[in-house]
Amino acid sequence: MSNYEVAMEAAWLVRDVKETDDAIGVAVSEAGKRLNETDKQYVEVEPGVTGCPACGEPFDAAFLAANTALVGLLLEIDIFNADSEEHAERIAKSEVGGALRDVPLEIIEVIETDGDEDGDRDDE
């Protein structure tokens, strides 16, 4: 059994905003609130970034049109005692997806981590 850090991308819809910075703040806040309400405080929530297609420079993953924004969020969770990478992905999607119902999630990276930082917790 191994431990993994799983990174996911989420697409968050924010209505009635006029600026992308406001939309990003609302998205991070709402996602954090929903995770906290379901005792998932251990999930890290950050604004997502995407690369410029022309120069590759990173910029905020938010698109604003008609006072409605689609914000990309980066969610990270540590999974302990998983049988494989695929098992860690399923556990992560189940944990986060249960709290963030109706929010599209995509696994973007799975990294096997070293040993017993917090090995007594089992996220299954």
Swiss-Prot record:
Xref: InterPro entries: UPF0212 (IPR007564)
Highest taxon of source: Archaea
Similarity field: Belongs to the UPF0212 family.
Protein name: UPF0212 protein Hlac_0869
Organism of this sequence: Halorubrum lacusprofundi (strain ATCC 49239 / DSM 5036 / JCM 8891 / ACAM 34)
Native organism taxonomy: Archaea, Methanobacteriati, Methanobacteriota, Stenosarchaea group, Halobacteria
